[in-house]
């Protein structure tokens, strides 16, 4: 739309502006439902949890105002300044997120490449851990409001929560396109209700407005000492979900996300925290559940229903984000191939990964059954999010130096205060390690080990198989020679998939050795994943002819694209390289991996790599190859 010619704008200014505005409004509403679902449910538990460390001897007026000030200024500094103002501009062709930023930095990584990869994988692992904790905590905190409707519901909180979560994961395979259009409006109503409730209760004590003065936050931390640091771990709950702003950049774009934040989300959150603070100033007994106690008795049940809907939407956003992140990791070579199903005929972003969905479901239900309440689960929350934020800040420092050409002094001046603040938050959350905080740490370690093992093992496997490779050009020259031992020529086209276009594929060598035939046309096909989200159609392939019978083709995909080989080969046919897809055979090499104590990895890591390789999705399904045209030839490889 930005490239419309001036004369076109002059001819139809009203229609054009109307079309652009409608698109912007739709994107703003969509971002409210997807991007801000997580941070929008934080008021359910954040203020309550932050009060607990200082409530052992009652809370003073100064403590409540100082605590509220901490929350408002955390939202202002971390979310508004770091994410909304700075990070949303650090896009990789419109895409955001940890792995997208990592892919962008790889282009200019230099000697820091390995450090950046480790940082990126840790950040991705922390997000996946967060994807387990967020649905459990959000749904539990919403359903617990039923206890205020009637105490008789107390015994049903966990069963209801588990049923909601099982239902949420069960519908993933059917897609969320039909209900997703309601996510934005429902979440917008949620923010309006939250903001309205907070605005009404500010009148309980207008003194809460002093919280806008950051000095009260500083004074609170200075006076509370150790307990102030503990409180910071709970205050951080107000900004959980901030990483989603960056991760979902590609879905909605920078402007809609920024408009939604400044026009609705930030004001609603600020008003709600002010309202909870004013309510506690008026009635300290409201500390038990200040969010729901802002509503009159008749409105608590409707508020619980709306909150439950909002938490389901927030959980859906995290699940979708996990699917998207894992797909990126697969395409970038950090995870083995997994089955990826598309739940929409029009939106390629709506995907479903059965393996990831199952892992998340069992993890989320286990967390609910283990911790049993949002109070207990909130202690486990925060470490994964703060860790992910610290990782993002470190990577962003490298980004502004290399991509934006900031001087070292400007980068330090802007980002050091942010990093120090996030490190303080991380330290405060680490105090909860013994009280459930070990859960996100263990999850992050597990996911990081899996990704680093797969990347390292794949590199070792590639190096070992290459040692015995036959150079492709030498192979072609030898088989093209006329001799009594020349292989039999058969009609049709054979396409051999390989990771190294400079070597003769193992499947080609095995076919020649055992069947003694060569096709009229032989295509050596390599699939490349680029460090950008999408590749233009004209850049989809490169074709190099080695002889009349042999050609090397490289197909290029972005890390956000579906690697549909059959469809991509259609571009090749249009250029004049003709072949009949129905008389074409796709040859794949299937390796049986055998552990080698001298592989370069510890024995346990070697066994883990082999186990991961055995779970990898069938390449014919993953690359969308016609099942009845695929031939697999096996071999043993020692790794």
UniProtKB/Swiss-Prot annotation:
Keyword Transferase in annotation: no
Catalysed reaction equations from the record: K(+)(in) + H(+)(in) = K(+)(out) + H(+)(out)
Record-annotated membrane-spanning stretches: 27-47, 64-84, 115-135, 151-171, 182-202, 225-245, 261-281, 293-313, 351-371, 377-397, 408-428, 430-450
Membrane topology recorded in Swiss-Prot or TrEMBL: Multi-pass membrane protein
Cellular localisation: Cell inner membrane
Stored InterPro entries: K+_transporter (IPR003855), K_trans_C (IPR053952), K_trans_N (IPR053951), Kup (IPR023051)
Disulfide-linked positions: none
Protein task: Transport of potassium into the cell. Likely operates as a K(+):H(+) symporter.
Record protein name field: Probable potassium transport system protein Kup 1
């Amino acid at each position: 739309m930005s490239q419309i010619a001036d004369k076109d704008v002059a001819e139809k200014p009203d229609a054009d502006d109307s079309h652009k505005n409608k698109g912007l409004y739709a994107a703003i509403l969509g971002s409210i439902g997807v991007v801000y679902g997580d941070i929008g449910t934080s008021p359910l538990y954040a203020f309550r949890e932050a009060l607990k460390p200082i409530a052992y001897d009652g809370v003073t007026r100064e403590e409540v105002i100082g605590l509220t000030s901490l929350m408002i200024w955390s939202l202002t500094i971390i979310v508004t300044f770091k994410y909304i103002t700075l990070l949303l501009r650090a896009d990789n062709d419109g895409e955001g997120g940890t792995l997208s930023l990592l892919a962008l930095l790889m282009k200019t990584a230099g000697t820091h490449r390995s450090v950046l990869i480790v940082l990126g994988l840790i950040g991705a692992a922390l997000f996946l851990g967060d994807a387990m904790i967020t649905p459990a905590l959000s749904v539990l905190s919403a359903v617990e409001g039923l206890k205020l409707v009637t105490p008789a519901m107390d015994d049903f909180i966990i069963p209801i929560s588990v049923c909601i979560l099982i239902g949420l994961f069960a519908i993933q395979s059917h897609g969320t396109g039909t209900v997703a259009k309601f996510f934005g409006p429902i979440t917008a109503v949620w923010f309006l209700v939250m903001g309205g409730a907070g605005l009404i209760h500010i009148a309980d004590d207008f003194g809460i407005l002093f919280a806008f003065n950051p000095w009260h936050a500083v004074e609170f931390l200075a006076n509370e000492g150790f307990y102030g640091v503990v409180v910071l771990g709970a205050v951080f709950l107000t900004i959980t979900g901030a990483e989603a702003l960056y991760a979902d950049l590609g879905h909605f774009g920078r402007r809609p996300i920024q408009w939604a934040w400044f026009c609705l989300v930030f004001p609603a959150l600020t008003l709600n925290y002010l309202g909870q603070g004013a309510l506690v100033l008026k009635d300290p007994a409201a500390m038990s559940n200040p969010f729901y106690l802002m509503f009159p008795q008749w409105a608590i049940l409707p508020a619980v229903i709306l909150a439950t809907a909002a938490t389901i939407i927030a959980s859906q956003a995290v699940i979708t984000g996990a699917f998207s992140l894992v797909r990126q990791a697969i395409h970038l070579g950090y995870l083995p191939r997994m089955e990826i199903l598309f739940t929409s005929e029009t939106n390629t972003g709506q995907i479903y990964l059965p393996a990831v969905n199952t892992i998340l479901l069992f993890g989320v239900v286990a967390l609910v059954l283990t911790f049993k309440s949002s109070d207990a689960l909130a202690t486990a929350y925060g470490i994964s999010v703060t860790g992910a934020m610290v990782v993002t800040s470190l990577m962003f420092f490298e980004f502004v130096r290399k991509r934006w050409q900031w001087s070292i002094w400007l980068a330090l001046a802007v980002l050091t205060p942010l990093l120090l603040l996030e490190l303080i938050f991380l330290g405060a959350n680490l105090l909860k390690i013994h009280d459930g905080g070990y859960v996100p740490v263990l999850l992050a370690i597990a996911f990081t080990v899996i990704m680093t093992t797969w990347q390292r093992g794949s590199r070792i496997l590639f190096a070992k198989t290459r040692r015995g490779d036959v150079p492709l050009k030498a192979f072609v020259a030898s088989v093209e020679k006329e001799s009594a031992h020349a292989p039999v020529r058969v009609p049709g086209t054979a396409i051999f998939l390989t990771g190294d276009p400079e070597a003769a594929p193992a499947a080609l060598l095995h076919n020649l050795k055992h069947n003694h035939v060569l096709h009229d046309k032989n295509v050596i096909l390599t699939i490349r994943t680029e460090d950008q989200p999408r590749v233009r159609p004209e850049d989809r392939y490169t074709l190099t002819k080695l002889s009349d019978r042999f050609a090397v083709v490289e197909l290029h995909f972005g890390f956000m694209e579906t690697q549909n080989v059959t469809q991509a080969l259609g571009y090749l046919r249009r250029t004049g390289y003709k072949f009949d897809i129905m008389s074409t055979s796709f040859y794949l090499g299937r390796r049986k991996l055998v552990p080698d104590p001298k592989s370069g990895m510890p024995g346990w890591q070697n066994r883990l790599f082999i186990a991961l390789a055995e779970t990898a999705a069938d390449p014919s399904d993953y690359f969308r190859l016609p099942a009845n045209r695929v031939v697999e030839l096996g071999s043993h490889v020692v790794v």
